[in-house]
Amino acid sequence: MARIPEEVIDQVRNQADIVDIIGNYVQLKKQGRNYSGLCPFHGEKTPSFSVSPEKQIFHCFGCGKGGNVFSFLMEHDGLTFVESVKKVADMSHLDVAIELPEERDTSNLPKETSETAKMVEMHQLTAKLYHYILMETEEGTAALTYLKERGMSEQMMTTFQIGFAPNHHATITSFLEKRGMDLQLAGAAGLLSERDDGQMVDRFRNRIMFPITNDRGQIIAFSGRLFDRDDGPKYLNSPETPVFNKRRILFHFSEARQAIRKQEEITLMEGFMDVISAEEAGVQNAVASMGTSLTEEHADLIKRLTNRAIICYDGDRAGIEAAYKAGTLLVERNRLDVFVLQLPAGKDPDDFIRASGPEKFKEVYKQQRMTWTAFKIHYLRKERNLQNETEQIGYIDDCLREIAKLDQAVERELYLKQLADEFELTIETLKQQLQQSLKNSQKSRQMASYNEPPIDDSFMGMMPQEGAEMLFSFEQPAQKLSAHTISEQQLMKAMMESRDNFLLIKQLLGDTTFYHDNYEALYTYLIGYFAEGNDADPTKFMDSVPDAAMKGLISSLEMVISPDEQGKPQFEDYIRSLKRYKLEQKKKELEQELATYNRENDNENEIRVMLEIVQLNRQLNSGQLD
């Protein structure tokens, strides 16, 4: 198993910027000293995910996951610790030497995880073979010529790892079998098909192959395109598998992530060739859905990275309909700012770039975007005879309903003027009609609010409460916490952040244990961490803790706000609070026992328990809690 020197791990951890790394996966906004965004580990519409650049940690107050930059990538991308250190170093452009093992050991993984890891490995190997066949063999010559004639450079073929599946039944079957791969598993992965006689054969034959990656950049599927005949579907995609769900996958999303984040917008296209041509033309933030309409899962994925989308679909009727559906989803579900780039009729982005050139496409891309409202007003014209008065009135009413949805008065004025000019109406007349539309729109929103489901009671614990103690940075919803919980938090946080504090508190605690088991477990980890001679560093401490729940507890503690100055008097107060709570809990247990003995007329035990309660009351009243 590969190991990395401790000093290299420390260098990467200390020099990496957690905001920059996580920002490649989550759209982060600055709030006070920290950054917040939608958690990538559970579905949510209100941000509860917080990243601290000062402490170099993340924590989600919704699902409880937390950690440092390494644990984020381990959780999000399914990496080993060594792989996560390597990826952080690469993403941070750090010049450190980290070697990864050639093959990942999956023997200790659960069966399901082990099988999916092997499926991914099979796809990686298969993609390399397909690409080699296209670029280096005689069998790939026709496909290579076809791609070059379409204007694709060899550089793009390599960037996108495009390949060719020859017209044989056993190219991939034999290739995988020679490497000891399970052919039944390869079938379940969508690489092979089973014939009626039970023999496994290649699923893809005589097709140009486009690898499909997940949001971790791993190849998990293929789309094969016919190029020299018409005896089958133009595109053949991998079936749904344990590693591939087309409702959740956008072509080129992982590779475009950095450009999307930098430009603060994403470009949606329909086809693989459109995305590849756009990349070659310099538009690097383009993605495409996998032969399906944009889904809610796609929309949520986009929302996590940006608030703006440019839809650049085909210029035919089907493309316009698809743009309307996609834009409606993004606006109504995710509240994105949507623009539409309409190409000439019958042209897709790939056609346009090949016919007009990259520079013309970039010019159109930057200068001819339609706002979502402008596109919808244009869309509402379709199949309407605007020479007919009834059709005109219906069209104007529909347009006013769209204009009524706009928040900005300037925008409303602009579109009203356009309508007034086109139909020779006064803008005052349209404004009167618009006011009625606004009233109707407000009534609709009020009715919708009456029908909203009640807030789940389980969420109320996270809601701000009157008189709540603000223990956390304001990114976390305020909670009213008990004194003993506050004490445990402050003691553990103080110990993690200072070896001197650890030694002092350990001495003051003596035989006293933490009330909550997870704090007691974390305390045990901390004792071992300092016993190994490590310095106080919560982010480094996280790496020594194998349990994900413990990492989440550490990150939550690091979000706790502590008093400016804490020393022995404060620590003694916290420990007294902890001891008092334990005695109070013991008293409650004895009172329950007393009630039981009283019902059972067990006088002997009743007297014994009463004496114990009297003794506890004396301790609590005197302050002698030991």
UniProtKB/Swiss-Prot annotation:
What residues bind Mg(2+) 1, as annotated? E270, D314
Q: Which cofactor does it need?
A: Zn(2+); Mg(2+)
Query: Which residues does the annotation say bind Mg(2+) 2?
Result: D314, D316
Please list the GO biological process terms of this entry. Answer: DNA replication, synthesis of primer
What is the cofactor note? Answer: Binds 1 zinc ion per monomer. Binds two Mg(2+) per subunit.
Q: Can you tell me where the transmembrane regions are?
A: none
Which reaction does this enzyme catalyse, per its entry?
Answer: ssDNA + n NTP = ssDNA/pppN(pN)n-1 hybrid + (n-1) diphosphate
Q: What subunit structure does UniProt give?
A: Monomer. Interacts with DnaB.
Record note on domains: Contains an N-terminal zinc-binding domain, a central core domain that contains the primase activity, and a C-terminal DnaB-binding domain.
Annotated family: Belongs to the DnaG primase family.
Q: What is this protein called?
A: DNA primase
Species for this entry? Listeria monocytogenes serovar 1/2a (strain ATCC BAA-679 / EGD-e)
List the gene name: dnaG
